[in-house]
Amino acid sequence: MTEPEPTLEQEPTPEPEPTQEPTPEPTPEPEPTQEPESEPELELKQENGCTKASEQKSPEEFEPPEGGWGWVVMLASMWCNGSVFGIQNAFGIMFVYLLNEFGSEHDADLRFKTAWVGSLSMGMIFFCSPIVSVFTDLLGCRITAVGGAAVGCVGLLASSFVTSLGPMYFTYGIVFACGCSFAYQPSLVILGHYFKRRLGLVNGIVTAGSSVFTITLPYMLSGLLKSVGLYHTLRVLAIFMFILMLAGLTYKPLLPKPVSSSKPGSRCPPLSRIFNVNIWKSLGYRIWAFGIPAALYGYFVPYVHLMTHVEERFGPEANKEVLLACIGITSGVGRLIFGRVADYVPGVNKVFLQVSSFMVIGVMSMMIPLCHVFGGLIAVCLLMGLFDGCFICIMAPIAFELVGSQNVSQAIGFLLGMMSIPMTVGPPIAGFLRDRLGSYDVAFYLAGIPPLIGGAVLCAIPWVEARRKRREAANTAENTEKMLESRSPPLEDTVCRTEEPESVI
């Protein structure tokens, strides 16, 4: 036992060479390769905040719970739609006070200039939508909505301190409107996380929130404007935006996000998440995205100028708030009815509901100058509100049908962004025609033409989608047939193989 020990002590001279071999062994260990694989899973858990079962599923396999916390989210989204579009739809009440506060009787373009305040506000809500869709995909519905409500609150507070139309363009027309845009769009996207089978009904209930506010806000604003004035009224409306901040905290996302295709260790999102070009590959979506803006050049004109038109025709004592209330009541009823009906209309055939709504809205806009009795205006507003609710409530369900749940955020965003141009331009043009012609008659006649044209364009969408599905079905059948032919042996070989043993026998 003592003899081998010196031999081991003498051999270290050749052994240093193998001792260097184990040193590189820790480098090929697969530990660093495992780290980037676990990071997307942690990000999914932090961003989605949902159960493990839903995290493991792809967005295509995800099934919404159809209720639960979704009912709370629905009520929060309803408040969002009400506070955002209720204030916008009631701008006709503030329009009269803006004319008296900032205008002059000697200004020939007074209505044209003042109408830009409301038009900028409504237009910017939709103009910012493509940017909002990117923020919604990157930051989530909750952060985007809460941040937008905070900006809207600041915009209304700042508007309560201005003393001329110039700053009002910025504070009310841009800052407040941008905040509303960031708060509004997530309220539509989050509904797809909780509902699928009842999505049409839920969208009808949510969008009915603007109808409830359109009914009540005109009376509330009239009382506030008479008692406390324009500036304190704007501060009261800022409280609505603060409540909207609290409502946005309920937007807990459930839809799992796909694993990022960016390089491991890179925190930059892929370009496809920032600008999703896949939605533009659908011809049906392209027709939809261009047909709806074409129909909306005259859509916002009655909401801005109808109150002034009533004062000019029926006198300042006319109960003009009743007209907005009629639009709001029937709009809410229409959203509930047509939202439920849309659940039973298969696929993209829901577009025909929008077509009918545009046709009726166009005809009713042309009927406004023909009403020389106040009761006739009430009937026109009732029908206009009913089909206005139809157009609004099925916008999100149609987007889900055309592009799928994973792409719906940017699909709605780009659509609303394209809607901003006609909704911004329409009311100032109507005000310009009034200042030049001395009457709103021509303005309302022209406002009814674009909805008729846009509705006719939308009729092509179901035909285009049906042709696409037939083509896809034919391609899949052809591919499966080729796969079966490649896997099965040729018929001649099988015949030869069966004949050979018979000849041997």
Swiss-Prot record:
Residues 15-31 have a biased composition (Pro residues). Keywords: Cell membrane, Membrane, Transmembrane, Transmembrane helix. It is a multi-pass membrane protein. The chain crosses the membrane at residues 67-87, 115-135, 143-163, 172-192, 205-225, 236-256, 287-307, 322-342, 344-364, 378-400, 412-432, 444-464. It catalyses: L-tryptophan(in) = L-tryptophan(out); L-tyrosine(in) = L-tyrosine(out); L-phenylalanine(in) = L-phenylalanine(out); 3,3',5-triiodo-L-thyronine(out) = 3,3',5-triiodo-L-thyronine(in). Residues 88-114, 164-171, 226-235, 308-321, 365-377, 433-443 are extracellular. One of its GO terms (cellular component) is basolateral plasma membrane. Residues 494-505 have a biased composition (Basic and acidic residues). Residues 1-14, 32-41 have a biased composition (Acidic residues). Pfam families: MFS_1 (PF07690). Residues 1-66, 136-142, 193-204, 257-286, 343, 401-411, 465-505 are cytoplasmic. GO terms for biological process: aromatic amino acid transport; thyroid hormone transport. Residues 1-64, 474-505 are annotated as: Disordered. GO terms for molecular function: aromatic amino acid transmembrane transporter activity; L-phenylalanine transmembrane transporter activity; L-tryptophan transmembrane transporter activity; L-tyrosine transmembrane transporter activity; thyroid hormone transmembrane transporter activity; transmembrane transporter activity. InterPro entries: MFS (IPR011701), MFS_dom (IPR020846), MFS_trans_sf (IPR036259), Proton-linked_MCT (IPR050327). Disulfide bonds: none annotated. It is found in: Cell membrane; Basolateral cell membrane. Its main location: membrane. Belongs to the major facilitator superfamily. Monocarboxylate porter (TC 2.A.1.13) family. Sodium- and proton-independent thyroid hormones and aromatic acids transporter. Mediates both uptake and efflux of 3,5,3'-triiodothyronine (T3) and 3,5,3',5'-tetraiodothyronine (T4) with high affinity, suggesting a role in the homeostasis of thyroid hormone levels. Plays an important role in homeostasis of aromatic amino acids. This is Monocarboxylate transporter 10. It comes from Danio rerio (Zebrafish). The lineage of its organism: Eukaryota, Metazoa, Chordata, Craniata, Vertebrata.
